[in-house]
């Protein structure tokens, strides 16, 4: 292409205008090689270079104007097209293309959504036939004979054998034999027969093939526990039971009148048949059922078993492809199955007290409650009549998203240039794949590589599927503490930075051009995603202004290559360019922004503990104190490092009992540059009651043994940092000691919570607390008994299984889990109250997503969100004084479970016949203080970094 002084401005409406060469080139990366200008009143001259004129410029989101500096770079359109095709990261996974076909060929409505859910959940999208013509007529079919003809032929050949085996299995359970089995004390075999007889051979084969193909996907993983025979058995058993439920439910539903059918759901059937359901939900039963069916994969020479050493003294039996299957598989791994749960193309069904929501098939052939219970808890979480949990889940699930196609296009075109450490080039084959025998370290390295590749393919593949969907939804549910989790796999806002960067809100936030605050938050986010979150807000704003040219010309890669969060920074650059281009459009006074900008709480677990205990000293280090945008945000980890070094120096001067090795370790740590990243993960876990052993291991995680050394460890991210084993112990124990000595009220709170858990454990009662959101958490961890079973027909190997003993508490778990569960529940309650404020705040578009202590909204809503978060903390900890309410909940539970008059409110002593000495209940006033605290909640309102 001939270069000249006239260059083109290329707009999203494919309109162009004249500009001189010092202005730069504007183009859409998604159409970088298409330059098709056949619009009226647009003139082009290609003989002497580009010349263009346009009457107007209209901006829509997914085709922004992007500046590119031609003084530094020249562009040859054909070369760029050729080069980018060679470096494409575009997902070429065949199974994703087939699902894309299904969505593209159908209207976006509830019927199509139901069809998608059925395809994914029942694995009805698979065909192994060689009759391509028939399959091509049905876009819902994934023809595995196209994906892998030899594998498809093997599965096609084995199908008649499987049908014959399954038919014989069903004949093995005649009615008289079932009656005989029912009379036995162990009814597992009876219920196995019940389920097998209640399914069609096709349903059983679909489950078998799904799990076989799951094992074959990236089969070269050496330490993949998801392919263990136990995990596959549980998974298969669960699927078969769900299919059985659906079949039985439909039988009953079809007998009802049309009016009755409208309000009859799977949950109704399960309540009516709770005795059967209780048995079929049993872990041992589902394992035995799944193992019986998965054994057929060995009988038909599809899979074989292998014993793998996972870790020291930890072995696992895993499913592996047989030699026959291995011959037809690619060595670098291929995805053979689609994720079962993906975003929805229509708004999720709302949860009510009567009907389960989320996916449209929920309460039809799947059954997922609004609160997902934990299997090792005896008692379920209770939702009170007046609650905010249903609104929380329904509101978050109703927020629409769309794919950031500009980010997706950029990644597909330039992934290998700018994201070498973040993405795996599709053409790259790991050298360890060709090595026959691997060391433990090499196995871990290869597994990590393949897991990353599988995650990347799923995220990019799903992004391609939803590329042209104008609005899709991400349903959520809650765990037993009220914490919100996304239901879809891979492509969701709680996934990786890659997934988050590909998500935009489907409806814009309106940001007025003169809204300095909103613009500032957008710039602050840009600086933070680049890696400058430790600078003051104003310094981040100045950095964006100073680097404006490279942000405009982000394709040159200068900033992207240096960015800490490259994908998020790329999304910011694209959005900021849209804003700059919008400034040129004088017909509108606002900018429609779709980008979620994220801000995090500072050490959120410690924030809740400081507010619970009203510890003003601790809160000052957690950005809960007065600050301005000129101030540098507090960094709790760096603060603790400084305190720790002071502690070591004091110990060296005053502690005469230090051993020579300890003194050597102290001096080494003092002279070494302890960076915050080394201690961050360990410190983060302290509010969650981590043991000293685990704390030390968290610190050690970032290190590895130096080559040819048995005593020196090097920090992986900075090999110049070298430590010995004793140094990790000194770090872990020293940091905890500093924390407790520096913050006395925190120490008192931790001791109080520990004592509460110990008292409840001694009394053998669950620990129950009520959250202001209407959720009642009932912590009741039970011990697990070991059961040995022999599930294989062809092997004498026995499995040791852990099953829940619902008669005996797990005392140690009850004690250690109380504080982390309480903190997580308070985190969840804060979010629930915040969203209640947020959705009632005004009638305009509500866009928000959350990752526990991270919040993302459009720039025009960030100021409002921060103000509401401050009000939430004040309501929860000042107005309602939650610690006193917690104390009252625990006492009420004790009084209700013990003999009348056993709890002396004055002495706080608990007496009873089952324990000889009185049990002392901790005094909450020692934490809060009889003298009013100097904690000033009004200071919260003046904090500029409560989110940063």
Swiss-Prot record:
Matches recorded under PROSITE patterns: RNA_POL_PHAGE_1, RNA_POL_PHAGE_2
Catalytic activity reported: RNA(n) + a ribonucleoside 5'-triphosphate = RNA(n+1) + diphosphate
Family label: Belongs to the phage and mitochondrial RNA polymerase family.
Active site annotation, chain numbering: 600, 680, 853
Protein name: Probable DNA-directed RNA polymerase
EC assignment: 2.7.7.6
Species this protein is from: Podospora anserina (Pleurage anserina)
Localization annotation: Mitochondrion
One Pfam family, short name: RNA_pol
Gene Ontology biological-process entries: mitochondrial transcription
This protein's GO CC annotations: mitochondrial DNA-directed RNA polymerase complex
InterPro entries cross-referenced by the UniProt entry: DNA-dir_Rpol_C_phage-type, DNA-dir_Rpol_phage-type, DNA/RNA_pol_sf, RNA_POL_N_sf
UniProt GO MF annotations: DNA-directed RNA polymerase activity; mitochondrial promoter sequence-specific DNA binding
Keywords carried by this UniProt record: DNA-directed RNA polymerase, Mitochondrion, Nucleotidyltransferase, Plasmid, Transcription, Transferase
């Amino acid at each position: 292409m001939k270069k000249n002084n006239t260059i083109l401005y290329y707009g999203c409406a494919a309109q162009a205008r004249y500009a001189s060469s010092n202005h730069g080139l504007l183009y859409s990366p998604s159409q970088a090689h298409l330059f098709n200008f056949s619009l009226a009143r647009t003139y082009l001259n290609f003989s002497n270079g580009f010349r263009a004129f346009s009457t107007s410029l209209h901006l829509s989101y997914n085709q922004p104007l992007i500046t590119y500096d031609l003084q530094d770079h020249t562009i040859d359109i054909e070369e760029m097209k050729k080069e980018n095709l060679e470096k494409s990261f575009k997902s070429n996974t065949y199974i994703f293309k087939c699902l894309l076909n299904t969505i593209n060929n159908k209207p976006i409505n509830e019927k199509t959504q139901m069809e998608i859910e059925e395809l994914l959940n029942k694995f009805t999208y698979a065909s192994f036939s060689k009759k391509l013509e028939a399959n091509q007529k049905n876009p819902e079919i994934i023809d595995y004979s196209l994906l892998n003809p030899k594998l498809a032929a093997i599965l096609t050949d084995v199908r008649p054998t499987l049908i014959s085996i399954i038919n014989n299995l069903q004949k093995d359970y005649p009615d008289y034999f079932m009656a005989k089995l029912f009379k036995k004390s162990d009814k597992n075999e009876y219920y196995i027969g019940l389920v097998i007889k209640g399914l069609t051979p096709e349903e059983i084969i679909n489950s078998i093939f799904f799990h076989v193909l799951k094992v074959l996907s990236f089969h070269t993983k050496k330490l993949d526990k998801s392919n263990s025979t136990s995990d596959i058995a549980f998974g298969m058993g669960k699927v078969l039971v769900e299919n059985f439920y659906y079949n039985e439910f439909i039988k009953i539903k079809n007998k009802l009148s049309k009016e009755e059918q409208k309000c009859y759901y799977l949950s109704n059937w399960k309540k009516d048949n709770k005795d059967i359901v209780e048995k079929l939900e049993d872990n041992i039963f589902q394992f035995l059922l799944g193992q019986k069916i998965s054994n057929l994969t060995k009988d038909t020479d599809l899979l074989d078993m292998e014993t793998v050493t996972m870790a020291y003294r930890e072995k696992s039996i895993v499913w592996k492809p047989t030699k026959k299957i291995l011959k037809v598989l690619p060595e670098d791994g291929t995805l053979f199955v689609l994720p079962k749960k993906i975003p929805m193309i229509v708004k999720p069904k709302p949860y009510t007290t009567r009907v389960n929501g989320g996916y449209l098939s929920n309460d039809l052939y799947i059954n997922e409650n609004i609160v997902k219970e934990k299997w090792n808890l005896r008692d379920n979480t209770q939702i009170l009549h007046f609650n905010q949990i249903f609104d929380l889940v329904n509101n978050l699930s109703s927020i629409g998203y769309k794919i950031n196609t500009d980010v997706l296009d950029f990644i597909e075109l330039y992934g290998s240039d700018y994201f070498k450490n973040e993405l795996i080039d599709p053409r790259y084959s790991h050298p360890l794949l060709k090595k026959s025998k691997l060391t433990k370290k090499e196995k871990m390295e290869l597994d990590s590589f393949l897991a990353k590749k599988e995650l990347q393919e799923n995220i990019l593949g799903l992004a391609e599927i939803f590329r042209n969907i104008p609005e899709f939804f991400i349903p959520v549910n809650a765990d037993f503490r009220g914490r919100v989790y996304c239901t879809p796999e891979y492509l969701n806002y709680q996934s990786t930075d890659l997934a988050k960067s590909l998500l935009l809100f489907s409806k814009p936030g309106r940001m007025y051009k003169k809204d300095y605050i909103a613009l500032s938050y957008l710039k602050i986010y840009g600086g933070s995603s680049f890696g400058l979150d430790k600078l003051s807000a104003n310094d981040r704003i100045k950095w964006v202004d100073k680097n404006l040219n490279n942000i405009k010309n982000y394709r040159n890669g200068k900033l992207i290559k240096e960015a800490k969060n490259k994908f998020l920074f790329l999304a910011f650059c694209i959005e900021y360019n849209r804003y700059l281009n919008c400034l040129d459009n004088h017909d509108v006074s606002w900018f429609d922004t779709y980008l979620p900008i994220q801000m995090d709480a500072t050490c959120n677990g410690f924030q809740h503990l400081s507010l619970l205990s009203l510890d003003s000293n601790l809160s000052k280090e957690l950005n809960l104190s007065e600050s301005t945008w000129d101030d540098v945000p507090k960094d709790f980890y760096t603060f603790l490092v400084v305190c720790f070094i002071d502690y070591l120096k004091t110990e060296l001067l005053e502690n005469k009992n230090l051993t020579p090795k300890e003194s050597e370790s102290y001096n080494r740590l003092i002279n070494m540059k302890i960076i915050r990243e080394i201690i961050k993960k360990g410190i983060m876990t302290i509010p969650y009651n981590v043991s000293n052993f685990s704390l030390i291991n968290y610190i050690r995680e970032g290190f590895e043994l130096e080559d040819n050394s048995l005593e020196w460890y090097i920090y992986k991210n900075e090999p110049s940092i070298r430590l010995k084993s004793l140094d990790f112990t000194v770090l872990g124990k020293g940091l905890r000691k500093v924390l407790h000595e520096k913050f006395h009220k925190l120490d008192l709170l931790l001791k109080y919570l520990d004592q509460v858990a110990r008292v409840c454990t001694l009394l053998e009662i669950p620990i129950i607390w009520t959250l202001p959101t209407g959720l009642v958490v009932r912590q009741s961890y039970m011990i697990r008994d070991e059961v040995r079973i022999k599930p294989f027909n062809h092997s004498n190997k026995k499995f040791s299984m852990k099953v829940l003993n619902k008669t005996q508490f797990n005392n140690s778990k009850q004690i250690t889990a109380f504080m982390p569960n309480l903190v997580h529940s308070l985190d969840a309650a804060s979010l629930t109250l915040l969203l209640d404020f947020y959705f009632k705040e005004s009638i305009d578009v509500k866009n928000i997503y959350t990752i526990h202590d991270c919040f993302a909204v459009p720039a025009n809503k960030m100021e409002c969100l921060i103000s509401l978060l401050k009000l939430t903390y004040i309501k929860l900890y000042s107005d309602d004084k939650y610690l006193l309410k917690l104390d009252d909940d625990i006492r009420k539970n004790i009084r209700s479970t013990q003999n009348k008059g056993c709890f002396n409110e004055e002495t706080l002593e608990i007496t009873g016949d089952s324990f000889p000495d009185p049990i002392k209940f901790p005094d909450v006033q020692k934490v809060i203080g009889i003298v009013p605290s100097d904690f000033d909640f009004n200071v919260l309102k003046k904090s500029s970094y409560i989110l940063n």
